[in-house]
Amino acid sequence: MQFSKMHGLGNDFVVVDAVTQNIYFPTEVIKRLADRNRGIGFDQLLVVEPPYDPDLDFHYRIFNADGSEVSQCGNGARCFARFVVLKGLTNKKEIAVSTAKGKMMLCVKDDDMVCVNMGEPIWEPNKIPFNANKFEKNYIIRTDIQTLLCGVVSMGNPHCVTQVEDIQHANIEILGPLLESHERFPERVNAGFMQIINRNHIKLRVYERGAGETQACGSGACAAVAVGIMQGVLGSCVQVDLPGGRLMIEWQGKGHPLYMTGEATHIYDGVIRL
């Protein structure tokens, strides 16, 4: 199998062309490839497939290191876009893709930056999915060690965002797993911890479902900004500083798509026997 190793702000991926290669990924194979000591090592595996819809360019699949398939990864989307251009799978700079839960537009810029139209944030609890009677800007979520005030949203995958005073001392190692597997999230959740610097600048750490804390989470950055805007504490254009680097997020509010812009870096190409 031919593959590329890429990263988006330190969130690392193996990207595979399943357009020209006939490849199937059982859970056991994904886990073996994800092993950083015995395999390649990655946070997520990204698979480029032929489009299911003739009006689209590709189908985008994402697998976590534990073998579970998810429907969205913002950092991965940027790497996906750069990959298909680098490998000559398309000569377009604006690329339309489908995912397990919808469609995305990816725009590859000349400076190696990629802008992703992430679509509209989803707030209805049953669509996230999240166990709640109605939408609220803040939900009280009780864990074994702490009661938290959280915003909950889907960016194609579920996110729970809570504000913290100091991102460096947030109890993410304990709270992250408790939120990820909380009973109110039937499909588990990505847990974001946000420190607000000002209305246009936040710091963020994300504990991703199936992967643990990562260097950066693009959909998590989008979710944090969307929650902050809905709660009235952030402006429409926000710089998000993650452990792995910086993203710019823009959202004009309900009825509008949310845009994420950031780097996508190609590290190396390789071949491995499955």
From Swiss-Prot:
Important for dimerization, annotated site positions: Y268
InterPro entries, per database record: DAP_epimerase_AS, DAP_epimerase_DapF
GO MF term set: diaminopimelate epimerase activity
UniProt record, GO biological process: lysine biosynthetic process via diaminopimelate
GO cellular component terms, A-Z: cytosol
Main localization (coarse): cytoplasm
UniProt pathway annotation: Amino-acid biosynthesis; L-lysine biosynthesis via DAP pathway; DL-2,6-diaminopimelate from LL-2,6-diaminopimelate: step 1/1
Cytoplasm recorded as keyword: yes
Keyword Isomerase set for record: yes
Catalytic activity: (2S,6S)-2,6-diaminopimelate = meso-2,6-diaminopimelate
Positions bearing the site annotation: Could be important to modulate the pK values of the two catalytic cysteine residues: H159, E208
Pfam families hit by this protein: DAP_epimerase (PF01678)
Active site, per annotation: C73 (proton donor), C217 (proton acceptor)
Subunit text: Homodimer.
Family: Belongs to the diaminopimelate epimerase family.
Entry-linked NCBIfam families: DapF
Protein name: Diaminopimelate epimerase
Classification lineage: Bacteria, Pseudomonadati, Pseudomonadota, Gammaproteobacteria, Pasteurellales
